[in-house]
Amino acid sequence: MPFIKRTRRSRVLIAAVTAVAAALAVALTLALTVTTYDHTSPRAARDKAKGGVAGSVDCRKAKCVALSFDGGPSPTTPALLDILKQDGLHATFFVQGRGHIAKYPGILRRIAADGQEIGNHTWTHPRLTDLDEADARRELSRTQEAIERVTGERPVLMRPPEGRTNRKVAKICKELGLAQVLWSVTAKDYETTDSALITKRVLDQTHRDGIILLHDLHKGTVPAVPGIIKALEQRGYTLVTVSQLLAPAKPQPGMVYRP
């Protein structure tokens, strides 16, 4: 009986040690792949920067929020550009390669001609964290090259699909001269065509120094934009690009900016 008890205790002890080791391994993996990259907020970046602000808006003084659109260019983008132009506003467009830049280079050219800010949103919209380093770099570099061919300029901003990033992605972005931009407001406009609901979700979440994420390719989004602009301006917000929100700080390659 004593031998049986000792055996049982040994098994329990081994199981406990194994569980602890597994938990430590998971924690270490998460620490290495998720949290070990540099990140800051737009406000913190501004506070550390010195000098004057280029452009007409100083977000250190104004109540700013950045407006950004993912997933274009698409057939709905020109209508959005018309709205922004009518209101004298600029936004940041994180554009995609396959099915977008490749299919609608003329629309991308207009985005640039209208003075809108252009960022990189990968070629095929994969989770970059799931790819090996070579494939992840290819997703971004191919899109950089395509944007440059059409507009003559390479972006300095990117947005990782689904907001998923890690140390590997940060390393690649630093090498390619790209700062990473996340968001604080999402209307989840990919799951609804209800423009009123999209508007409500944006207004409910918006705060000073936030970054709004919308997708101009979805049916309900562009019709919601005029109401969003009007309501935010009535609340005292100034709508700006991501770079204007950061100014006088300059986007730092590899850095993750999240409000």
Where are these regions (language model features)?
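Structural recognition of the beta-strand scaffold that forms the well-ordered cores
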Residues: 65-68, 91-95, 117-120, 156-159, ...
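C-terminal domain-boundary segment and adjacent tail
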Residues: 51-59, 87, 100, 220-259
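Alpha-helical scaffold elements lining the catalytic groove of polysaccharide deacetylases
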Residues: 126-154, 162-208, 221-223
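Hydrophobic alpha-helical membrane segments, chiefly transmembrane helices and signal peptide h-regions
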Residues: 16-33, 117, 181-183, 206, ...
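Solvent-exposed loop/turn segments at secondary-structure junctions
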Residues: 71-75, 97-101, 118, 124-127, ...
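C-terminal region of N-terminal signal peptides and the immediate post-cleavage residues
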Residues: 26-48
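Active-site beta->alpha N-cap acidic-glycine motif
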Residues: 43-131, 135, 139, 144-146, ...
